[in-house]
Amino acid sequence: MFNLLFSSSNQRRINSYAATVKKINSLEQKIGNLSDEELFTKTSYFKDELKKGVTLDYILPEAFSVVREAGCRVLGLRVFDVQIIGAIILHQGKIAEMKTGEGKTLVATLAGYLNALSGKGVHIVTVNDYLARRDSEWVGQIHKFLGLSVGLIQQDLSKAERKLAYQCDVTYVTNSELGFDYLKDNMVLSMSEIVQNKFAFCIIDEVDSILIDEARTPLIISGPSEAPVEKYTQTNLLSNILFKDVHYEVDEKARNIILTDKGTLFCEDHLSIDNLYDLENPWVHYILNAIKAKELFIKDVHYIIRDNQVVIVDEFTGRIMSGRRWSDGLHQAIEAKEQVPIQQENQTYASITYQNFFLLYPKLSGMTGTAKTEESELDKIYNLEVICVPTHRPLRRKEFSDLVYSNEYRKWEAIADECYDMYRAGRPTLVGTTSVEKSELLSKLLTEYKIPHSLLNAKPENVEKESDIIAQAGRQSSVTIATNMAGRGTDIILGGNPSYIAKSILIDLLIKKISVQNNLKLQQLSLKTQYCINQILKSLEDDLIYANLSVLELEKKISIACEQVAISRNLEIQLRKAYQLIFQEYENIFSQEKKYVAQAGGLHVIGTERHESRRIDNQLRGRAGRQGDPGSSRFFLSIEDNLLRIFGGNKIADLMQALNVDDDTPMESTLLSKSLEAAQKKVEAYFYDTRKQVFEYDQVLNSQRQAIYAERRRILESGYPRDCILQYAESTIDDIVNFCLTSKENNEKFVNLNTKIKYLLNATDTFFISKDLYSDSSELKKWITEQVRINYDLREAYLEQIKPGLIRQLEKYYLLQQIDNAWKDHLQKMGALRDAIGWRSYGQQDPLVEYKNEAFNLFIEMITHVKHTVVYAILRSRLMVKND
């Protein structure tokens, strides 16, 4: 009944868009009759209408119709009705759930164009540089055709290039580049260094990956700290003589370690110290990380060793995360465990979670194939509603019920048997595994079965072949083993992907220098095509641009030639000719193979373990049955799998025992399916609570961050920072006077105050505050403030003689330097507070409430410190003038 109500609620939403879609369709002929120039002028017409007070919603039907027509003319692609619905959802600041292959990239152009008309800029966020560049060069042509500017942010861009890209109407950028640019903008020393404009509207592709999977991982800008490397080596050795359930307990659900009293005493005795928790010489942090590295972080599952370094493997995608490091000393603990060089621990200069970063946008939306299972979290944290968009063609994928085995060995045998059956039937098979270790185990098993297969995991030798392997995973009898990395990015096309194979042939010919005669892929093509390719290659030999290209530049030229982007240079034109010749022949070859594969049942997806989130499982299933193709999926499980063992294995094991199921017989029942779903919901709820807790704690820091960044911006924008300095001075004087006047001895009051003010003003020994002023503290403060102003005026006049405007530069420098230094130290203190606050729960205190209270006190201390330090630095600084 609930599902019925739920479905009808979503359907009512979809039905509510019908009138708008109908209106857009009614304009199609009228807009189609416009010339290119008339279509182009529509953009300026829409902008004028908005200036008159017309709303975006009012012009939406005509604007969407204009974009649809531009897409037909520029790319030869017509936007379907369901894609229009998806675009309306994005414009409304919601999440559009659209299945694999439904054309999400094109959907973003409609909402992006409409919102860019306001002149505030639109950010379209992708998960990697390649997708950002591809989308900007491909669908970005639609925006350019209609007169909008298109920007692209890539990792290697300079500040000036970034600034220009962010000033464009539509900017394509990755989530990490966008976040880091925000943090860097709040560390600059002049307004001219800021690259981003004010945030307005953001469309996030693969929104669940960024807002949920990445939610627990903050963006951090850091620098070297002074943490001693020896402590990691010592605690690694110590962890090896500590025993589980004796010296420490492991909480697998929370992925956390708890030292027992016996363990604490043992460690203190072994290290010859009195207190593990001593703030002046803390050891507990290092010990807990060493035990985490030993118990919870497994080689070839959570990380790999490459070039004598620990490289993180993303638990959601299976991809290696080069350049990323675990924070808070955990990475160093794993380096000590693996006996590779231990790199210096870093200190955080600036940080923000994706949760709080994307909430900075007044209007936020996103697209993904899998979000409905997480709609509660997306709504509660981001205020984002999820709406499922119908597929353009009916979904034909068969989803078989799970098979559960009593032990893992029998499960893997059954998976190998299934692969063999599919291989014999001519059906392509994609097997999703959860780790490098499991993927290699299955690969060995399939080798024993003599089943040809491709292996794709985080190992460097396999990562390089990722696109090729996935692009051809839909071919007849192909078997592909992949970690979760296969879930996104490249479509699996039944029969094979002619676009990818054509591109790979060009790379073989031009970069790897494999001749036409020795290229096995080319040998499958007609002699006429081989001859034409040879002629094109010969013509390139005389091209000076081609001759001077580096490998990376040539690879980029090939990518451009292989995509549907406008080109004009001879080199790119010749490369595209070669690409199209190869593509057309392979398209004919693969179309025949596609018919056979479709008749055999299409792509079969095998899941080897349930993930902690149903959403990740759905991503794997979604590889089959794209765009109305046939396909199927099935999960093979064992009660020894991590998810079932930790979150529900006993109940399921008892059920199997009650039904007297032997080791070789899989269990398949409605009751079992419900138990599996309950286990998965339990783990989803657990991790949601974890992310919610991260969010709640980071909200405390976020409010402080916004206050500091607002103060920084006020100083940067100020042409007269003197006012800020004098405000700080008044506050400092208040603090000094209030502190000194609380002294019990009158004589002591006078001496203390006189000494402190004399020091503040950098005055001579003759400086003296009249005792008559002490009777009225407000008059006393006014008098001291006036002395500070006089002192400041004299200092300003002196510096103006040396160099006009020098005092203003010094003011900004001192203000920003002290704020940045204090914020950096504050982040370290907040991190230490966050680590320690959990213990308060043992004293019947709410850790979050305690954290808020102590964080507030730390923040007030920091603000006070900044004000005092700036005022003392300005009033006591001595400028050395160098004579030429």
From Swiss-Prot:
Reactions accelerated catalytically: ATP + H2O + cellular proteinSide 1 = ADP + phosphate + cellular proteinSide 2
Superkingdom per UniProt: Eukaryota
Family matches, as SMART domains: SecA_DEAD, SecA_PP_bind
Chain sites annotated for binding ATP: Q83, G101, E102, G103, K104, T105, D491
SUPFAM superfamilies xrefs: Helical scaffold and wing domains of SecA, P-loop containing nucleoside triphosphate hydrolases, Pre-protein crosslinking domain of SecA
Enzyme Commission number, as recorded: 7.4.2.8
PROSITE patterns: SECA, SECA_MOTOR_DEAD
Recorded GO CC terms: chloroplast stroma; chloroplast thylakoid membrane; cytosol; plasma membrane
Function comment: Has a central role in coupling the hydrolysis of ATP to the transfer of proteins across the thylakoid membrane.
Record protein name field: Protein translocase subunit SecA
Organism: Porphyra purpurea (Red seaweed)
Gene it is expressed from: secA
